[in-house]
Amino acid sequence: MSIAQLFNQSWVEKSKYVPVRLSDEERKILSLLEAALEVIDYTGHVDIISYTTRTKLMVKYLNEMCSIVMGLVTAMDIKAGRDLLIGRDHKSNARFFQTVFEIGRRYKIMNPEKMRATYGAVMYMCQDSLIPDVRSQLGFDFVSPIKTVYNVLEKHKLLGLLEEKQLLNNLLKQSDPQSNANAKAELLKEREEASETLLKKYNPGKDEKLQKVLTDCFASLADHEAFLLANRNPVEKMRAYLHKFFNPHDTKNGSLKIGYMTGAKLNHDHKTQFFYVDQSLVFWSCMMDQMFLLWLESDASLLDKHSRYFISDTGQGLNRVQLCPLVRSTVTRILSSVQKQQEIPWMGSSVIHLGDRDVPNALMFIDKYRQVPHILAPLVKVLQQLEFLRDPYLVQYIENEYGSVNGLQKTILLDFFRHGFNGQGSDGGSCIDGRLTSAWNWTNEITKKKYYRILLMSGFLNFEGI
């Protein structure tokens, strides 16, 4: 599959990995789950090196989690709590608990910046509930399939809607943040007309429940497109800056050369480093485009009944190490597509660390690539804002120090492209995940940069995605 095919999948294919937006009732359940997760430190109790069986610990704390959730439900809605307590045991409420955890998993996929401290516990609880001995003692597990747009439309026999390519394109087209008011108004009009046409065609009887199903699916697909705009565009813009300010065959605008003498783990001349950075950015862009698919596959890998994990000290504390062939297959396919599109040979290693000490499991993998927009979006935003500075004193300071705003932009980019891609991220140096770790390590050094104060005055906050 080519890069163009990756970026231009049909709505039928996209809908298979786009989760459905949470309803108001589901958001209430989510708040209960998050509250319960704040009370119990599951991994702290269970993920330990022990000479005794961990099964008893798992069963104990999974039962405790169920009890906490039921208690919170009763406190919020006594009638709903009473209905749950009628069954007396947790097994009789298995479907409810599966729904609670599915809502948490689905919400995280659609909102990667949320549940940072608790999502791991959600996945590990679900993972442990699938262990045969644990499931046997509990009487059930916490896992149910993620609700996607495709599943919902299939259930209501509305899959034909996904073939309405032109109408869906008009409905889900995203506005450019730089576009003017007239363009935004025109886009809004197109969306309204497309929505009205689709609703008339697929809900001619104006059934309220069906109307809600359709509007929820539209909103969920729109969320996916908005995610692409917010997460893939910064990568594309950073790549555009690379080509604007630097030439692989000329160093007059600054040399990207790195070597062991400068603290790098790689030894690249200017041309090699240019293409090393460029290829890395192309790969990241493709990864962002397929992020929802990767989230679902990471979820499936972690909850694979046939793939057991083991606890190991990976050098970053105790972690669950688990093979994830499903995710590896997709990443390999994306990498292969990128490599085939390159005019020159692939620079650096093609090793993908998954299920080893560098990237122990699918959860660690997906969390790692979640950082891409956190690194690039703030940088791109500042680089753009520098072009529209209105403070004459700040502009004067920049001109005195760097010659011009353009000179400052080039300084920042030169620093990032050299030291953010210097191979310090992993033992492999230039391996696929090591490139991203190198960039993240560079962000940790940002406060030591000479230009850091100017970044702050230009609107920069942090690289935390907040």
Curated annotation (Swiss-Prot):
Its main location: cytoplasm. It holds the Pfam family DUF2009. It is found in: Cytoplasm; Nucleus. Coiled coil: none annotated. GO terms for cellular component: cytosol; nucleus. It comes from the Eukaryota. Keywords: Cytoplasm, Nucleus. Disulfide bonds: none annotated. InterPro entries: DUF2009. Belongs to the UPF0652 family. This is UPF0652 protein C16A11.03c. It comes from Schizosaccharomyces pombe (strain 972 / ATCC 24843).
